[in-house]
Design a protein with these regions (language model features):
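N-terminal binding-site loop/beta-alpha segment at the start of enzyme catalytic domains
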Residues: 1-89
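Structural motif
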Residues: 50, 54, 123-124, 157, ...
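Structural motif corresponding to the early beta-alpha repeats
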Residues: 65, 84-108
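Short, acidic/polar
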Residues: 39-51, 108-124, 172-176
């Protein structure tokens, strides 16, 4: 297996068009879900400084981050950092998750989304976001109502583009079709889960995005840190996504998704490939996501600035063809199921 070659000078982040729009974004995006819980405000500001200095000027947040009792705190932290820097950042956020106990405080209804966008703008300290995304599909609200509301948010100047997250391919196809039929703002992007241990979106969602010109901005490229190489199968994590630090419900979710013998067996083989290429498992894993031509930008999370060092290197890494084949062969089964199956 040949060694890796870089296509850009160190510290430079490649840019690309945001799907079929005229927007240009870095191929790496900073996720902010850790802000306010795993990373306090001081550390979060250091993380944003590190990212921006490296050219990662695309930030993604959500009104429910960091989830639990602290909903909204991540946006507040981002908003305070943004003061005086707003025009330097492509800013995305999401709505639809539960912001309170009432049923109308979540979902894709007109009431909730109009309330949610105003709340996000207030916390972020800005009068618009570049990309406003529906965080989750809401089967209880008519899709036309949700799409018309997102269109109204763009028309009001509160967002430049709209996107969705966590959508199944058939629902995404229907949503895209309805925006065309109703002459509404088109869906510019989709934010799915995607990594070497979860490849199911390759079967339907990625081809759909390619056909319709949607940008693809995957989250979880390191499988909640499992593909960072910092965990072993015998660990009992006391911090991070697999621990109670993030709340038991979230920890249970990530443990169910990834913490399995099969996943660690795969990681052992992935680590060998990374070593042969002279790179880290984390860099290899993100570079693999970015090597998919349908992927626009990969979302990176961090709970301290040092964690970005490895992951930022992925922007400069061109995987050789034989490495791509080896990685594809090794993880082929994850196109049909995840590590729990």
């Amino acid at each position: 297996m040949t060694g890796c070659e870089t296509s850009h000078e160190e510290g430079n982040v490649q840019y690309t068009t945001f799907g079929a729009t005229g927007l240009t974004v870095p191929r790496l995006c900073l996720g902010t879900a850790t802000f306010g819980r795993q990373a306090d405000e001081t550390v979060a500001h250091q993380i944003m400084d590190t990212a921006a200095e490296a050219g990662v000027t695309f930030f993604d947040s959500a009104d429910i981050y960091p989830m639990g009792a602290e909903v909204g705190r991540s946006e507040e932290i981002v908003g305070r950092w943004l003061q005086g820097k707003r025009d330097q950042i492509i800013l995305a956020t999401k709505a639809g998750g539960p912001m309170g106990p009432a049923r109308w405080q979540q979902g894709g209804s007109r009431k909730h989304l109009l309330d949610a966008v105003d709340g996000s703008l207030r916390r972020l300290g800005t009068d618009y976001v570049d990309i406003y995304q529906l965080h989750f599909d809401d089967p209880d609200t008519p899709l036309d109502e949700t799409l018309a509301t997102l269109d109204a948010i763009v028309t009001a100047g509160k967002a430049r583009y709209i996107g969705v997250s966590n959508f199944l391919a058939y629902r995404l196809a229907r949503a895209a079709g309805r925006t065309e039929t109703l002459h509404l703002t088109r869906i510019a992007s989709v934010q799915p889960r995607y990594n070497l241990l979860f490849r199911q979106i390759e079967r339907e969602l990625l081809p759909l995005a390619a056909e319709t010109g949607m940008a693809v901005i995957p989250f979880n490229p390191l499988a909640a840190g499992l593909l960072s190489g910092k965990y072993t199968r015998d660990d009992q994590p006391t911090e991070g996504r697999f621990s109670a630090q993030v709340g038991q419900r979230i920890a249970d979710l990530y443990n169910e998704r990834y913490w399995h013998t099969k996943a660690f067996d795969t990681i052992d083989q992935l680590t060998k490939i990374a070593s042969e290429l002279g790179t880290s498992l984390a860099t290899l894993s993100i570079a693999w996501v970015l090597a998919n031509p349908t992927v626009t930008s990969a979302i990176l999370g961090a709970s301290r600035p040092a964690q970005l060092t490895d992951t930022l290197a992925a922007a400069d890494l061109d995987l050789p063809d034989d490495a791509k084949v080896a990685l594809d062969d090794l993880t082929q089964e994850y196109r049909w199921g995840d590590a729990a199956r």
